Every structure is written in C-alpha cells, then in structure tokens.
C-alpha cells in the first residue's frame, strides 16, 4: 500500500523535504511506517522516537493499522519553558 507522510517544520528541516511517500505491506502500522522512514532518512532516526503521529487529524497510537492512501502526519512535542 502507499501512504503519504507529512513532516512538521522541524522534521522537514532535518530531512530536507516536507513529505515522504512510503510503500508498506497491507497490514502495516504507524510503527512500521516510522521504521521505514528511519531506514530511508537517517537524519530523522533520533527524532522519530519522540514524534506524535496523527491520522485524519486525530492523534493515534503507534500500533494503529494504516490504510492505503492515508496521510500520516508527524509532529514533534512542543518544548515548554
């Protein structure tokens, strides 16, 4: 299946692009997508451990099964101070 991944500004800056297209197995989860991104984009590896994933505008768990054509948005938590 194909999904689109939208990166937050900080992730896009580290990766050099705002969107990634992924080809995943039919039963893939958010965690599977994150593993594939880490393989393809080494600059994001350390940041992927703390991202907050969203699908269809809703925060989701890493165990959420994805569907073909969905957009997975990845945001970094905001730092307080």
Which functions belong to the PLM regions below?
Residues 1-80:
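Ubiquitin-like/PB1-type beta-grasp interaction modules and other compact soluble beta-rich domains
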């Amino acid at each position: 299946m194909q999904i689109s991944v939208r990166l937050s500004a900080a992730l896009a800056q580290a990766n050099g692009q705002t969107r990634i297209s992924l080809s995943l197995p039919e039963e893939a989860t958010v965690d599977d997508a994150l593993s594939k991104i880490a393989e393809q984009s080494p600059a994001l590896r350390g940041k992927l451990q703390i991202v907050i994933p969203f699908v269809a505008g809703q925060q989701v768990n890493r165990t959420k099964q994805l569907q073909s054509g969905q957009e997975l948005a990845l945001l970094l938590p905001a730092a307080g101070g």
